[in-house]
């Protein structure tokens, strides 16, 4: 017998719920890869005999293998930056005040409308490289910085191209309903103009996105500075009817009931959720919808309202941890930093945080049958870390500990 690869002198955090040990751990382990899949995993003492002359053997020097990390919420393709708004916030301006004065998302929209695809691709490639160096093997990229047909399609095309030219898998999300463009700004007491923009998203943008196969999912920002509950449901329902997965930015600044509505529609995830209440948590539990925690935005905006972690535990809602990398509220292109922040700021355990970037993140993207755990038959996406315990991934930051990355059975970083 021979395999494409065999890994020995390792410990494995499989993250499998089928193994009762913390992290689904197998110590003194071995792992075999064949045809891009995990062909065998278990104790090294149980490893079947194989042709050592025909099989490449990799020695982990006692380190740990984990599933490849999955960043399930990013806005990675954009132009420009918002360093000036950073200074405004430090001088007392709120996120909402900046947004209402024409800053925030709209300032990035203007930069993206001016940028061409080549510029956006190069910027996205650099950011994707940064995540890949930290063991990320799958990433979600949203649009939402165009807010017109041409630019929304441009951003999604760039995201698709990044996936074709990089070893990191890219899942794309259409977020045309990210903010209300200035040209559709409502008069006081009216939603006529923003309703017209929602019509544009549903009737013109979405069909073009589908025609070019540019999105795996559709997202909406449901908040008092963006889209109301009725508008949000219209967009999500249209996406669901078109056969796309749905997800939602919800309960970041207030409790509008978006999470419960999205759960009723079968959303894969609701994200941010600082103001999520117990009824909303129950709705997520009943629908199997994931709750995505975004500690980078919580930190950068200096928020004080914590996501309801204890309630999510109580009702066994899968918790996802993601970077929310974007120029305004989380300009932090580091998944490992998010693991640390999830623990130190939001009180997740290191095991919960790692599950949030592996097993649960895969569920949020609808790819839990392919990646996120190390089990026989799963895609061979995994990382080799120079650590003594998986908790180190959340405990320390700034020390390069990712030694190797295997993607689809191929060693891509060594």
UniProtKB/Swiss-Prot annotation:
- The EC category is hydrolase
Q: How is the cofactor bound?
A: Binds 1 zinc or iron ion per subunit.
- Biological or metabolic pathway of the protein: Amino-acid degradation; L-histidine degradation into L-glutamate; N-formimidoyl-L-glutamate from L-histidine: step 3/3
Q: Which GO terms describe its cellular component?
A: cytoplasm
Q: Which reaction does it catalyse?
A: 4-imidazolone-5-propanoate + H2O = N-formimidoyl-L-glutamate
Q: What is its EC number?
A: 3.5.2.7
* Protein name, UniProt field: Imidazolonepropionase
Q: Which organism is it from?
A: Shewanella pealeana (strain ATCC 700345 / ANG-SQ1)
